[in-house]
Amino acid sequence: MAKSLLIISRQAPWNGPSAREALDIALAGGAFDLPLGMLFLDDGVFQLAAEQQPTAVQQRNLAANLQALPMFGVEDLFACSHSLTRRGLEADNLVLPVQVLDDAALTALIARFDQVVTL
C-alpha cells in the first residue's frame, strides 16, 4: 500500500512558484491514486480566496486548477482556521470547500499522514 502524503502549502499564489508546485504535486499524486491531502496554512490560505486578479501581478490564476483537485481524487482539503481569520478570509467565500481546522486538529492531521511535504 502506498504511503499517505500531506502537502502543506504555506505561500501566497503571487509569492513565487511554491503554490503552483504544491498544486502540481497534489494533482500528479491524485492522478496516480496516491492517498494524499492538502493543507493550506499561513499565507497559503490566500490561494483559496475568491475573486483574485493574478494577472495584475503577472501570475497564473490557480483557481481552476484548485477546483480540479476533487476530480483528480484529492478530496482531503484543509485550511487552518487561525490563518484564515488572521488574513480576513471566511470559509464560506473560498473557491474550494475545505475542512477548517483549529490548532489541535492540525496537529492530529499532520500525525495521520506517513509523509509531509511543506512548500
Annotate the PLM regions:
Residues L36-D42, D76-S83:
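Short internal beta-strands
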Residues T55-H82:
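A glycine-rich helix N-cap at a beta->alpha junction
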Residues L6-R20, Q52-Q53, V57:
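Short, glycine-rich nucleotide/cofactor-binding loops
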Residues R87-T118:
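C-terminal structural segments of small proteins and small subunits
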Residues V45-Q47, T85-R87:
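Short, active-site-adjacent cap segments at secondary-structure transitions
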Residues A19-M38:
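Histidine-anchored nucleotide/phosphate-binding helix
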Residues A49-Q52, A91:
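Short acidic, glycine/proline-rich loop/turn micro-motifs
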